[in-house]
Amino acid sequence: MSSGYSSAPSVSHTSSEADLNRIESYEDGVDEEASDEQRMCGLSELVTSCLTSSKSSRQKDSFEDDDDVPIEIVGTLKKSKSKKKKQCPPNITIEKKNGNSSPFLKSSQFTDVPPTIRFYTKGTKVTKPARKIQSRLTWCHNSLLPIVMRQTLSASHFTIVDESLFHIGYWGRHLKSAQYKALQPHQKVNHFPGAFHIGRKDRLWMHIRNRLEHFGEEFEIMPFTYILPTDRQELLKYLETDVNRHVIIKPPASARGSGITVTRKPKDFPTTATLVAQHYIERPLTINRAKFDLRLYAYVPTFEPLRVYIYDQGLVRFASVPYNPSVTNISNKYMHLTNYSINKLAEADGIANKPVPKWALHQLWDYFDQMGVNSQKIQKEIEDVIVKAFISCEKPIREHMSRFLEQEFICYELFGIDIILDEDYKPWLLEVNISPSLHSGTSLDVSVKAPLAKDVLNLAGIHVPPSFDKLHTADYSCRPRNGTKTREQLVKEASWVAAYRDQHGAIDNRIFKRLTPEDTRALVEFEDELDRIGDFKLVFPTAQTAHYQKFFAEPIYMNILLQQWQIAQEGDRSIGIDRLEQLCRQKHMQSDQEISF
């Protein structure tokens, strides 16, 4: 397929307040199944008593030794000789599996780092926590909270409560940017401010096109797109050169197939309303003569440093009519569109004589393997597309977050990634949804989405709101990261970013010669996150992704640190984990700032 790619002017990432209000009036790539009367849940403040320290004294464990020699901080990663058992925060007991009951808490790998709540699928018997803890296990009710998520929360003894009551979690429609400022340190929400930069089709294309200008075919990951009405003349010129060319017209912030048409008629191209027109892939790969696309799930816990996970399972969605394109049937949505929300109606409309099929992702890989097609190669290429999409959009999202978010740790996000394969098995990014539907109308949906909901909440690292003594626990997740860095941290970051530029991206293990408290917090958080990975796969950063650093709009210290950490850890993760554990024992993470709430 001819890509139709061409150079483009640079794109500004800056949004005025007026633009922001206009953009946030749209539903940014939401594809949740829900009614028209869905309402935004206003997030209440946490109760003061849950943010104050408990009066209980900290007991000294028998394995502590005041004469312990500190681990060497200078030098590259060195394995600790210490055999000391790590300790949990006081007043938090990590219970072991009790008979047929699964544990409620997941301990950290590191001393004084709080445990996280474990989540399970429906039907799992989970050890009941103490009444004092259970009273804090509350989740904000809203009409977009899917059933599989409710069941997962219920299994771990959460209660769904009204938005006006104390709650520690929220899953629903994206918030307005200003609402993030009211969030409290122990609340968790499933969106980032500024996620519209990847969830809106026009913004997503603008940012990918910007990277395309710098890196050429490396970023030919999305069908060429026109933003209407601005690019209307460019689009008309493209269509005039070949009568067989068509484009797919989409609203920039819709989902579930709403408002999509395949056309080449100028009357369908607006002169006022904002739409996007995407090159139609004329030769898609088909199975049993039907066009199909892939819904994958990507999870991002933070944009600084950027980390991207992809879920092991997903869905393959088929068109309900055999693919046989011609001028006469170009408007047949059941042939050309693969959205399940559209094709599930084909049987009722008399277009199909049986329900539209849907596969689990592993069925597609098995099918390819049986056909002699290298499914592993296709999966790697899909991962490449997804990582590049996030890299294209990370800078404007980070900039937006810096304006509206004081604690990045309170946010996480699950994205729905739609991919189509052409006849050469090349993956193309169609769009990114910031509220992928977890509605489970079939047994196949449940088999994919119920474990997904459980694994997302586990990766999010949700803590019991603390009542223990913060002076003796590394409750680093509750501390603002913006504007509180020490001079030591700022100097180190500036020097390594400068070295990265001077050495054209070359970095080595000297970056670990002195791990600052901020470095240590970031690495501890990352290692514990990997310990809760479930059926997700980390695709960025890995030991093999160093070459992606050049694609970022600007070098970011934490990205560089984490990338080098992954390279250093490739042989034996226990070496780095042991070093971090020794730093935790020395209370290194708390040494750079006052603890106040």
From Swiss-Prot:
Q: Where does Mg(2+) 2 bind?
A: E431, N433
Q: Does the keyword Nucleotide-binding apply?
A: yes
Q: Which organism is it from?
A: Caenorhabditis briggsae
Which reaction does this chain catalyze? L-glutamyl-[protein] + L-glutamate + ATP = gamma-L-glutamyl-L-glutamyl-[protein] + ADP + phosphate + H(+)
- Record's InterPro entries? ATP-grasp, TTL/TTLL_fam
What's an example Gene Ontology biological process for this entry? microtubule cytoskeleton organization
For this UniProt record, the keywords arranged alphabetically read as follows: ATP-binding, Ligase, Magnesium, Metal-binding, Nucleotide-binding
**Official protein name in the record:** Tubulin polyglutamylase ttll-4
- GO molecular function annotation: ATP binding; metal ion binding; protein-glutamic acid ligase activity; protein-glutamic acid ligase activity, initiating; tubulin binding; tubulin-glutamic acid ligase activity
Which cofactors? Mg(2+)
- Name the site position(s) for Essential for specifying initiation versus elongation step of the polyglutamylase activity: R256
Residue positions annotated to bind ATP are: K250, R256, G257, Q278, H279, Y280, I281, K291, F292, D293, T338, N339
Q: What is its EC number?
A: 6.3.2.-
Q: Give the region (Disordered) as residue ranges.
A: 1-39, 80-107
What range(s) does the TTL domain occupy?
134-472
Where Mg(2+) 1 binds, per the record, is at D418, E431
Q: Which domain of life is it from?
A: Eukaryota
Top EC class for this record: ligase
